[in-house]
Amino acid sequence: MAMAGCNGFFLHQLRQPRLQLARQLGRTPSRAYSAPSNGSIPAAKKKYVPTKGTYPLGFRTSGTIVGVKPSNTTKPDLALLTSDAPCVAAAVFTKNKFQAAPVTFSRNLLERRKNQGIQSVIINSGCANAVTGKGGLEDATKMAQEADKCTGQNESTIVMSTGVIGQRLPIDKILNKVPSAHGALGGSHDHWLAAAKAICTTDTFPKLMSRTFALPSSPGVEYRIAGMTKGAGMIHPNMATLLGVIATDAPITSAALPSALKHAVDRSFNSITIDGDTSTNDTVALFANGAAGGKEVAEGTPDYDAFRAVLTDFAAELAQLVVRDGEGATKFVTVRVTESASEEAARRIASTIARSPLVKTALYGKDANWGRILCATGYSLISEPGQPINDVPEIAPEKTNVSFIPTDGTAELKLLVNGEPEKVDEARAAEILELEDLEILVRLGQGDKQATYWTCDYSHEYITINGDYRT
C-alpha cells in the first residue's frame, strides 16, 4: 500500500507540468479514458452507441450548441424533447439536501399539474445551476417559459441541468438558442442521438436506447420506448443518480406512471455506483403520450405488470451504460448478493461492496484480493460506531461464500466456501480479471432474497479527470 501511494505521488508530480501547460493554453490535456477533445467517440466505446433505433410516435428531439461553458464552441449542450400532444409525466429526484434549482422547479411543476399536461423537457449541460439561490430558480423558470412559448402551452416544460455546481447559468445565451432548438426538432435517430450528445459532460459516449414492446390487452399494437441518460462521475444511488429521460407512446394513467417509474428506478438507476457521490441534480423523468393508441394502462392490471417489467428491464440496461462509462473505468462489474434473509440487507451489502475503494482499486490492478470483498461485506450492516456485531444476524461468517463468476460461461472461481478460504488458482483468477466484464457473487446462506448492483473499477484516470474538472 505504501508503494502504491508513492507511485501515485510520482505520477502526480509528472502530470503537473503537463496540466499547467494545458491550462496556460486554455485546454485540458488528453486523457486515456475521456472523450477526445474533438468530440469523437473512443473506439472501445463505439459498440455501445446505436446506429439506428425505433422511437416512440409523437416525440421529437434536438441538440443545439449554446456554449454554456465558455470553452465549448463545437459540441451541442442544449437538448430539447417535445411531444406533439400533452403527456402524462413522472420523475424521481435526488435526495441530496442541496437540491438544484431545476430539481425544485420540476418537482413543483409536476405536483401542480398532477403529472398531467407536460409536453417538453429542456436540458443544458456545462452548468448544474445548483446552489445558486433565488437567481438560479428564476433561471430555471425562464428556461421552461421559453420552451413553453415554442409549444404554445403554459406550464408544460420540466427542466434539467448538469455540470459544475455553484455557478449561475449564462441564461441569456440559453434563452436566445431555445427557438433554434425548437426549430431543429425531429424524430429521426440522428435527432435523438444529437439530444443524447447534448446532455453529456465527462461522458465519453452518448447513452441512447430504444425498443418495441407489446401489452396483453392490445397484442396487435406495437409500442415503443426510448431513453437517453448521462453520467460518468458523481454516481451513487439515493434516488436516481444522474439525468435520464425516457419516453413511450403507450397510454399510461397519471396514477400508474409514477409507481411504475419508482419500481424501475429502484432496480436500475438506484442500483449503480461509480464513486459513491449523490449529485444535487439527479433526475429521471418518464413521459407517456399515448400516441400508439390502445387501452389505457392502469395499476392492478396485466397491462400494468407487463409495462412495469418492460420499463424496469429497459431502465436497468440504460443505467448500466452509465457504469460502462464510469470516469476512468476499465471494467464493468456486477455485484450479486444472494441467499439473504432480506432484500434490504442484500442491497446494503451489494452497495457497500460496489462502492468500496479498496475493492475497486484491486479490480483495476487485476488483484484477486477477496479479503477486501469480505471486509466490505462484514461492515456493510454496521450503521453506528460501536454497534455490537451481534446486532447483525443477517451475516454469518461460517455460512458466507464468495466467488468470481466469469462472463464467458466458464465455471465460477470459488474464493471462500462456508467461511473457509479456498486455494485460489491465481492463473485462473488473472484470466477472469483480464475480462472487461466480471461478476462478484456473495452467498450469505441465510435465506432466499437477493440484490444486484453494478459498478466499475477505480483507475489513476479517475483522479486526473476530477482533479481538473472545472477547466
Curated annotation (Swiss-Prot):
Keyword terms of this UniProt record: Acyltransferase, Amino-acid biosynthesis, Arginine biosynthesis, Autocatalytic cleavage, Mitochondrion, Multifunctional enzyme, Transferase, Transit peptide
Broad class of the protein's primary localization: mitochondrion
Active site (record annotation): T241
Pathway field: Amino-acid biosynthesis; L-arginine biosynthesis; L-ornithine and N-acetyl-L-glutamate from L-glutamate and N(2)-acetyl-L-ornithine (cyclic): step 1/1; Amino-acid biosynthesis; L-arginine biosynthesis; N(2)-acetyl-L-ornithine from L-glutamate: step 1/4
Protein EC: 2.3.1.35, 2.3.1.1
Protein name stated in the entry: Arginine biosynthesis bifunctional protein ArgJ, mitochondrial
Origin species: Chaetomium globosum (strain ATCC 6205 / CBS 148.51 / DSM 1962 / NBRC 6347 / NRRL 1970)
Annotated site residues (Involved in the stabilization of negative charge on the oxyanion by the formation of the oxyanion hole) in this chain: T162, G163
Similarity-based family: Belongs to the ArgJ family.
